[in-house]
Amino acid sequence: MSDILSELHQVLESRKGANPDSSYVASLYAKGLNKILEKVGEEAIETILAARDAEVSGEHQALISETADLWFHSLVMLAKLGEHPDKVLAELQRRFGLSGHDEKAARSGKH
C-alpha cells in the first residue's frame, strides 16, 4: 500500500510548479491551503454520509469511492505542507498494538 502512496506523493510534488490550468492538483495548490482544507472537509462529510448509507443499504462502493477522495485530498494537504505520507504510516505503525485509551492518554499527557 505504501508504494501507491509514495507514487501519488511524487505526482503531487510534481504538480507544485505546474500550470493551474493543466492540473486539478496544481489548481488546488494555486488556490492555497484554505481551498485544500475546504476540499478535505467536504470529502470528510461525503464519506460520513456514504458510510451511513452503506450501513442501511449494504452497498459499499460509494463509501470506498468517497474514502479514496478523502485520502487523496488529505495527501494533497500533506504535500502542500511539505509532509510525506510515510510519516503518517510511521505514526500508525507506532500506534499499532497500543490500546486506544493508552494512546489517547499519551497524546494528552494523561497517564
From Swiss-Prot:
Q: Which GO terms describe its molecular function?
A: ATP binding; phosphoribosyl-ATP diphosphatase activity
- Top EC category: hydrolase
- Hey, which family's this protein in? Belongs to the PRA-PH family.
- PANTHER family reported for this sequence: HISTIDINE BIOSYNTHESIS BIFUNCTIONAL PROTEIN (PTHR42945), HISTIDINE BIOSYNTHESIS BIFUNCTIONAL PROTEIN HISIE (PTHR42945:SF9)
Q: Which GO terms describe its biological process?
A: L-histidine biosynthetic process
Q: Give the superkingdom in one word.
A: Bacteria
Keywords in alphabetical order: Amino-acid biosynthesis, ATP-binding, Cytoplasm, Histidine biosynthesis, Hydrolase, Nucleotide-binding
- Predominant subcellular localization, coarse grouping: cytoplasm
Per the record, the pathway is:
Amino-acid biosynthesis; L-histidine biosynthesis; L-histidine from 5-phospho-alpha-D-ribose 1-diphosphate: step 2/9
* Catalytic activity from the UniProt record: 1-(5-phospho-beta-D-ribosyl)-ATP + H2O = 1-(5-phospho-beta-D-ribosyl)-5'-AMP + diphosphate + H(+)
Q: Which InterPro entries match?
A: HisE (IPR008179), PRib-ATP_PPHydrolase-like (IPR021130)
What is the protein name for this chain?
Phosphoribosyl-ATP pyrophosphatase
- Subcellular localization, per the record? Cytoplasm
Residue spans making up a coiled coil are none
In its UniProt entry, the species of origin is given as Alcanivorax borkumensis (strain ATCC 700651 / DSM 11573 / NCIMB 13689 / SK2)
The coding gene here is hisE
One Pfam family per UniProt: PRA-PH
Q: Name one GO cellular component term.
A: cytoplasm
**NCBIfam families for this protein:** histidine_hisI, PRK00400.1-3
